[in-house]
Amino acid sequence: MLPAPGFHHLHLNSVDPDAAINFYTRHFPSTAKTSWAGLPALASPNNVLVLFTKVAAPPPTSPQTAIWHFGWHVTDSRKSLETYRSRPDVTLLPLYTGDDGGAVFISSDTWPGTGGVLGLTKPQIADAKARAVQPTRVGGFAYMKGPDNALVEYAGNHPAERFNHVHFFQEDPYCAQLWYQEHLNAPVYAGRTAPAQMTQASCKVARGADRTFPALEPDGMFRSPSAAVVFGDVAFLWYMRQGEQPLVSPRGHLYDHIALSVADLDAWVAKLRGEGVRFLEEPYKLGASRAVMIEGPSREALELVEVR
């Protein structure tokens, strides 16, 4: 079996890559400006890149693609929040609590989730209120609006600041997990395993009926089912798509594609072609390396970059 790929980069389209990079290095000081394959880039200390392609017009963020947002671990998310409050170039995004229009700017300021879910349904909120459950006010996740209308998460508390995840929507999260395991040999992310004995024949399950809070939308969000895999130390986290319309290709959107690193591109091409995976682009030169572009289960564009 070929070893699982590593996470190489997230590729964004931007009207001003230099300004975008300056924003991220200011607010996530562990990062640094760099370049890769002739493209401006942001480097995270865990050997992860965010690459930028300059575009003439603001890149679209709708209709919804499989790529929802990306995020960082931070050492103290509440301290980060207070820092960002004082910075005029940061737009903090409210998390709605499901309690008569209430909102907070960090999840630890509202009722904690339960059962491994990062939110509560309205009946669970009523129960938490009746039992006088209190916010933890420690750590938590929060969001800001980044350059080009990027949705950027920061979450704590963790040992070090680093780029740590890309959050997706999937048509069928359990099926997506099986797809990534089968075709990309991806390890399952701890705590997000699919139900036992799940197969491609049984992986399609109904979206949970109840929306949960806190959420970026006032009406809440669907968090069930959820699944995830991990490449290196970057998690691919999945919820089912929130709307009724199928997810579209991300190419040309703000979040254009995601790249994984492999040691032997030819071996991966042979494996994936033999398994019937759809190729979006045949092998091509990328800087001093080579790459190929494939399509994931919900139309996400995945670039495999040869890194020897």
Model-derived regions, located:
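Vicinal oxygen chelate
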Residues: 1, 82-168, 190-230, 237-241, ...
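Post-signal peptide N-terminal segment of secreted/secretory-pathway proteins
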Residues: 56-75, 79-82
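Solenoidal tandem-repeat scaffolds enriched in leucines and small polar residues
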Residues: 172-196
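Short, solvent-exposed beta-strand edge segments and adjacent coil->beta transition regions
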Residues: 5-9, 65-69, 161-165, 253-257
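Mature N-terminal segment immediately following signal peptide/propeptide cleavage
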Residues: 2-37
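Conserved acetyl-CoA-binding loop of GNAT-fold acetyltransferases
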Residues: 26-33, 88-91, 182-188, 277-278
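Helix N-cap motif at beta-to-alpha junctions
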Residues: 15-17, 74-79, 172-173, 262-266
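Extracytoplasmic/secreted envelope proteins and their assembly/folding machinery
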Residues: 7, 17, 21-25, 77, ...
